[in-house]
């Protein structure tokens, strides 16, 4: 069992190194003025590989089926997000409507990832088909995504200049955007509260600071990045990368401290 736990920790360290390497690639391309699509594509491949590796890993490690499904869906959503981002940045700059809808599509992952986390937390230690009413939350999630995808018709999520002039730089946020922010905040906060309440082992409870720190670091970096436009005009990590890596790191921390049942080290 010790060897299995060590192997899991080793894979976690490798994942962190891959994430840092992705940031280093972007810094290198910025310093050498080679910020072209080739470097950006290489970055996407790095992060996509990390997501795929994690998704395959949890499909084998997670014992409880309903939690495993939530995590695999989460990995699929992250991969979708990275794929959409790659398509958007490999498209011509003047694609306008096409590029805008690719951007809107990011919110599929942003809305559903916190929901998958909430579902998984509710499922910890519960038999299958318990409290299926929680899945009704898929309805408001789908409505939020639909409102974003149809934003061109009502501009309740993003407000643009007339005729969508310079849409990717000149826009403001509408009420739907703020509803999504609140949606994400409530689901993440609820997931944390559930994790604390469901943590009955004192040793595990003492380690709950780890996932909380991960969430705080992700929030602080995102706010700082948006307010200061990165470091010297460079955003080392974009929102999709931070969001996805924070989700993976959060889940791994919950698995490692023993809150989420897995077949590596759980019950030690």
Give residue ranges: language-model regions.
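Transmembrane alpha-helical segments
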Residues: 50-52, 113-118, 188, 192, ...
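Alpha-helical transmembrane segments of multi-pass integral membrane proteins
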Residues: 60-83, 104, 135-139, 171-229
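Interfacial "cap-and-anchor" motif at the non-cytosolic start of specific transmembrane alpha-helices
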Residues: 2-12, 36, 43, 197-267
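Individual alpha-helical transmembrane segments in multi-pass integral membrane proteins
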Residues: 35-52, 63-150
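Extracellular-loop-to-transmembrane junctions of the mid-late helices
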Residues: 32-48, 146-194, 226, 231-237
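First transmembrane helix
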Residues: 9-63, 72, 180-198
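Alpha-helical transmembrane segments of multi-pass membrane proteins
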Residues: 16-33, 78-88, 149-151, 222
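The cytoplasmic-loop to transmembrane-helix boundary for the fourth helix
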Residues: 3-17, 124-152, 207-213
């Amino acid at each position: 069992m010790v060897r299995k736990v060590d192997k899991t920790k080793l894979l976690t360290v490798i994942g962190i190194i891959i994430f840092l390497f992705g940031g280093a690639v972007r810094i290198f391309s910025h310093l050498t003025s080679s910020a072209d699509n080739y470097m950006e594509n290489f970055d996407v491949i790095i992060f996509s590989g990390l997501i795929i590796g994690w998704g395959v890993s949890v499909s084998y490690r997670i014992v409880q089926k309903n939690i495993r499904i939530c995590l695999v869906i989460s990995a699929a959503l992250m991969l979708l997000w990275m794929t959409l981002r790659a398509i958007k940045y490999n498209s011509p700059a003047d694609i306008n409507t096409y590029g805008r809808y690719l951007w809107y599509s990011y919110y599929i992952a942003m809305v559903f990832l916190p929901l998958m986390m909430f579902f998984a937390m509710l499922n910890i230690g519960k038999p299958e088909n318990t409290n299926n009413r929680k899945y009704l939350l898929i309805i408001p999630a789908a409505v939020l995504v639909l409102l974003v995808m149809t934003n061109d018709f009502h501009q309740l999520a993003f407000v643009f200049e007339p005729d969508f002039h310079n849409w990717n730089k000149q826009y403001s946020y509408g009420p739907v955007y703020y509803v999504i922010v609140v949606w994400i905040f409530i689901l993440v906060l609820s997931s944390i509260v559930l994790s604390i309440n469901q943590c009955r082992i004192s040793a595990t409870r003492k380690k709950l600071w780890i996932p909380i720190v991960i969430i705080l670091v992700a929030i602080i970096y995102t706010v700082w990045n948006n307010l200061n436009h990165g470091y010297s005009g460079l955003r080392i990590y974009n929102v999709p990368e931070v969001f996805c890596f924070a989700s993976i790191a959060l889940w791994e921390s919950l698995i490692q401290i023993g809150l989420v049942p897995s077949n590596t080290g759980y019950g030690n």
